[in-house]
Amino acid sequence: MQTIDTVNPTILLAIELSASTWLVAARVPGLEKPHLHRIDGGDTAALLALISSLQARAARRLDATISVVCCFEAGRDGFWLHRLLTAHGVVCHVLEPTSILVNRRARRAKTDRLDAEGMLRVLAAYLRGDHQTCSMVRVPTPEEEDAKRTHREREKLVQEKLRIENRIEALLFTQGIRKRPSLRSWERDLAALRTGDGREIPRHLRAELDRLRRRLIMTLELIREVEAERDQAAKTKPQDQACHKIAALSRIRGIGENFAAVLTREVFYRSFDNRRQIASYVGITPMPYQSGGMDRDRRISRAGNPRARTTMIQLAWLWLRYQPGSELAEWFRERVGTLAGRTRRIAIVALARKLLIALWRYTETGVIPAGAEIRAEITVAA
């Protein structure tokens, strides 16, 4: 844990990032008020020069070695700035924006200056040991960050595929046609279709449908290309720890190559000390509510990785289908029985939480979830 050094004075920096400008708030030892410096967005040379200048002036004034600790909010800029500053000897923290404690007034002022000064106060409190003021993001390595690209790109392509298919169905539905033509026999099926009032498909609509078909075919080809790249990466790095976990998850019946890759690259590549940490990271822990004589759990926090959370909810439903003899599936049936609706949806989240913990233990220790069926062979190790 990084704390304020009481021997060597420390300069605290908070960087408010935007596309056009960066606002740097600096708290220099010996000065009461923070100093604000505005530089062009992305001008790292100016930022490093500013840091060096602040260090040099503080060192001359105090005749001591000056260290620098900075922070900025996680967002669209990613983590490259963190790596750059770290490489230049600056201790850098990335703040989780939604975790910062704020004033709960109905209307709050919002300016870059207030945000930068607020981050500066949060950073100072965090370095003093008050970790309730905000949460810090664990910065992935460049390799870990790049490994997520494949399954995230596939997710976007699948969404694009669904959008195109829904658009084709919607256009046909406006003409009273409820059947979508097959891609394999597109021309023949489209020529045979008739509108609800007996006409052929209008010329411009036919042209738009043909263009949508070409987009759909290209999207399907890209999905296959991304999946092949994913499979090839697992084959070329069989000793890699992440690839080993993907292969292990793929052995469990009901978990496919894509789910195994998503869970490993998004969750299991990290180290967790206990089950509460991993459930909190995915955001499927219930939020306690205790006041006076009332003490109950409310909805899940949803404060973690949304992609991993969605995957676990989907996997929980699939677990009931493909692992009906497991202890987790039996627990779900005993708890829910024949109930449906809201009760069943609440219980599936609890099942997802238990399943996540069981899979985490499996990838770390090799202990198979109780009653789960394991595939005899792995046809595709990815």
Please provide the spans of the model-predicted regions:
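Short, basic/hydrophobic alpha-helical segments
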Residues: T44-V69
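Gly/Thr-rich phosphate-binding beta-strand-loop-beta motif of the actin/hexokinase/Hsp70
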Residues: Q2-V28, M119
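Low-complexity, acidic/Ser/Thr- and charged residue-rich accessory regions of DNA metabolism proteins
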Residues: G293, F332-A382
